[in-house]
């Protein structure tokens, strides 16, 4: 029941590219980003601090860094354009911000897919108090 409540709360704030990010994760990793990655480790979900706990958490850390490098963009609300060509996601469109955010989301979705074998349920709903180590630079 607690998980359903968390998902409902997270959906309240979802807009723009966050919906598209969920779609990319579903297409590439064949999993729901909300159900698998919205509250995982120290970096998957809102905020992020400490050190990534495993390869999956590192996907979120790198994604946060990628968003941080998207200068003059609001990554959580910018919509973007992409297509599928030969089973691959291709980011495009005329908006440089949108393309940059799409590339961040695409890389994270691929990272999630590639690290499914190392996903560890012990990091789901991981307590923030366990994420107090000095963060590494992006």
UniProtKB/Swiss-Prot annotation:
Catalytic activity: a 1,2-diacyl-sn-glycero-3-phosphocholine + H2O = a 1-acyl-sn-glycero-3-phosphocholine + a fatty acid + H(+)
Cofactor note: Binds 1 Ca(2+) ion per subunit.
Tissues in which the protein is found: Expressed by the venom gland.
Keywords recorded for this protein, A-Z: Calcium, Disulfide bond, Hydrolase, Lipid degradation, Lipid metabolism, Metal-binding, Secreted, Signal, Toxin
Alphabetized CDD domains for the sequence: PLA2c
Cofactor(s), names only, from the UniProt record: Ca(2+)
Record note on quaternary structure: Dimer.
Name of this protein: Acidic phospholipase A2 beta
The organism's taxonomic lineage, starting at the top: Eukaryota, Metazoa, Chordata, Craniata, Vertebrata
């Amino acid at each position: 029941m607690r998980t359903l409540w968390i998902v409902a709360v997270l959906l309240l704030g979802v807009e723009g590219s966050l919906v598209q990010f969920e779609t990319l994760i579903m297409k590439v990793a064949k999993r729901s980003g909300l159900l698998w990655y919205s509250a995982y480790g120290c970096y998957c979900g809102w905020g992020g601090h400490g050190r990534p706990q495993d390869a999956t958490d590192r996907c979120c850390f790198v994604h946060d860094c990628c968003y941080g490098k998207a200068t003059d963009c609001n990554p959580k609300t910018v919509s973007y354009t992409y297509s599928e060509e030969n089973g691959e996601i291709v980011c495009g469109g005329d908006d440089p911000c949108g393309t940059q955010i799409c590339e961040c989301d695409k890389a994270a979705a691929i990272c999630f897919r590639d690290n499914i074998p190392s996903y560890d349920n012990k990091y789901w709903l991981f307590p923030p108090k366990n994420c107090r180590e000095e963060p590494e630079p992006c």
